[in-house]
């Protein structure tokens, strides 16, 4: 029994971070029980993809305890319903919600053959997928008899509080607020007046970068090949990960930030850092690769109803949105 911490920023307390401990247990498990308060759309999409790619995880039961009474976004609800359909069709588990009371706990149980580990503490499911999250979490790591007791407690919680998401009434109202960037590390919100002043100025340099819609790169990195570790576990690319591959005729222009970091300020008031990378002397492209950038791009498309879960960005997507360049 020991505590584990997020270890983000300058506060490294334990040797292994909470994310590393959770993911190691998850990768080696054949059965997983999860009871969490909140989930993000991207965490559910990525969990679904992982289960498609790794069939050694035989069963997952997931209880989402807060959203049914507090409110879902359309994307959250849709991704959970799709995950539930997949799990039930494959006979590998189900997704549950709490329609009677708000459940705010965070409990996880991992069974690897007969060995059981557990985690209980402050971290919602989202924390284990989102490397941009700024919230510092801590959990208690259990094994042996305490882990077996926690497993039984999670099963009891799901049984007593949970109803399958398809067996409860569909929500009549959804939350449409786009908060993808609000809790991200390195992201600031800029006052509207400052944004108006900045965008009223004439830029010294101006670049129009086409939004490319290749099947498995650029804005569709999620659909590229996942990362396979030594044990054969395949982890998909993050849903919000993107890369903008910029052609040499743009990168060679005066003022383009070659191999350096720069500050991004968006028209809807977000500020964060990006950087260009790539071997300028050997290739005709450079990359701006950042999950925060992807949250902004895909978040805009999602909030305008142009992009759905597990859907590729196409020219039609961009035309529907009304902009095909940056």
Swiss-Prot record:
Gene3D superfamilies: Endonuclease Chain A (3.30.870.10). Its EC number is 3.1.21.4. Pfam families: RE_NgoFVII, RE_NgoFVII_C. GO terms for biological process: DNA restriction-modification system. It catalyses: Endonucleolytic cleavage of DNA to give specific double-stranded fragments with terminal 5'-phosphates. It is an enzyme of class 3 (hydrolase). This is Type II restriction enzyme NgoFVII. CDD domains: PLDc_RE_NgoFVII (cd09177). InterPro entries: RE_NgoFVII_C, RE_NgoFVII_N. A P subtype restriction enzyme that recognizes the double-stranded sequence 5'-GCSGC-3'; the cleavage site is unknown. It comes from Neisseria gonorrhoeae. The lineage of its organism: Bacteria, Pseudomonadati, Pseudomonadota, Betaproteobacteria, Neisseriales.
């Amino acid at each position: 029994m020991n505590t584990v911490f997020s270890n983000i920023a300058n506060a490294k307390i334990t040797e292994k971070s909470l994310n590393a401990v959770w993911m190691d247990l998850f990768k080696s498990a054949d059965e997983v029980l999860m009871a969490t308060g909140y989930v993000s759309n991207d965490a559910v999409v990525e969990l679904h993809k992982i289960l498609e790619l790794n069939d050694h995880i035989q069963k997952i039961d997931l209880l989402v305890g807060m959203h049914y009474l507090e409110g879902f976004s359309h994307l959250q609800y849709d991704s959970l319903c799709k995950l539930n359909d997949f799990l039930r069709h494959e006979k590998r588990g189900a997704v549950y919600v709490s329609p009677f009371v708000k459940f705010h706990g965070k409990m996880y149980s991992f069974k690897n053959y007969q060995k059981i580990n557990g985690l209980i503490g402050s971290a919602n499911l989202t924390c284990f997928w989102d490397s941009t999250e700024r919230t510092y979490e801590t959990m208690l790591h259990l094994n042996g008899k305490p882990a077996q007791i926690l497993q039984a407690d999670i099963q009891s919680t799901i049984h007593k509080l949970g109803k399958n998401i398809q067996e409860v009434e569909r929500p009549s109202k959804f939350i449409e607020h786009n908060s993808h960037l609000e809790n991200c590390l390195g992201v600031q919100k800029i006052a509207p007046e400052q944004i108006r002043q900045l965008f009223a100025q004439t830029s010294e340099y101006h670049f129009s970068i086409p939004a490319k819609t290749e099947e498995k790169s650029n804005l569709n990195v999620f659909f590229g090949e996942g990362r396979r570790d030594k044990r054969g576990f395949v982890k998909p690319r993050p849903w919000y990960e993107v890369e903008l591959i910029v052609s040499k005729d743009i990168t060679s222009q005066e003022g383009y930030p070659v191999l350096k970091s720069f500050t991004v300020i968006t028209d809807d008031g977000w500020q964060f850092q990006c950087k260009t990378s790539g071997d300028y002397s050997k290739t005709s492209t450079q990359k701006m690769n950042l999950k925060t950038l992807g949250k902004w791009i895909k978040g805009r498309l999602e909030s305008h109803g142009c992009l759905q879960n597990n859907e590729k960005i196409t020219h039609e997507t961009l035309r529907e949105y009304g902009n095909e360049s940056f």
